[in-house]
C-alpha cells in the first residue's frame, strides 16, 4: 500500500475557501481602520495649528497661513511654504483660517482629499476657538462618499 504524500485537491480547495472568507471579512475592517487613522491624523495636525494660533494671539499677533511682511501677523505653519496656501499634509485638499483678528475667536478648517481614503475624501474637520480660548473639534462627513460615525477622531463631534 502506498502512503499518501501531499494534500488532496479537496483539502487545498477548502484552505483557499477559508482564506477567501477571512480576506472578505478583514479587508473592509482594514479600510475602516485606515479611514479612522487618517481623520485622527488630520485632527492632530490641526491641533498643532491650535497651539500656534494660541501663541500668536498671546503675543498680540494675527494668525495667518502664509508668511507676510507685517510684524503684526504670525504664520501658524500649516501650509507647505511661506508663500503658499497649499497644506503641508498630503491628506488635506485645503486648509482655511477664518476669524481670530478681532476678538480671538475663529476657526481652522481642513478638507480631506488628495491621498485620503476615498470613503472620507471631502470630509471637513474644523477646530473652533471661542473668545475665551476654548477649542472645539467638529467634523462634517456629509460630503464624503461613505463616511461613518466611527471615523470621528476622539474628541470631535459631528457638525
From Swiss-Prot:
Residues 67-87 have a biased composition (Polar residues). Pfam families: N_methyl (PF07963), Pilin (PF00114). The modification N-methylphenylalanine is found at residue 7. Keywords: Disulfide bond, Fimbrium, Membrane, Methylation, Transmembrane, Transmembrane helix. Its main location: other. It comes from the Bacteria. Moraxella bovis can express either a Q or a I pilin, the inversion of 2 kb of DNA determines which pilin is expressed. This is Type IV major alpha-pilin. It comes from Moraxella bovis.
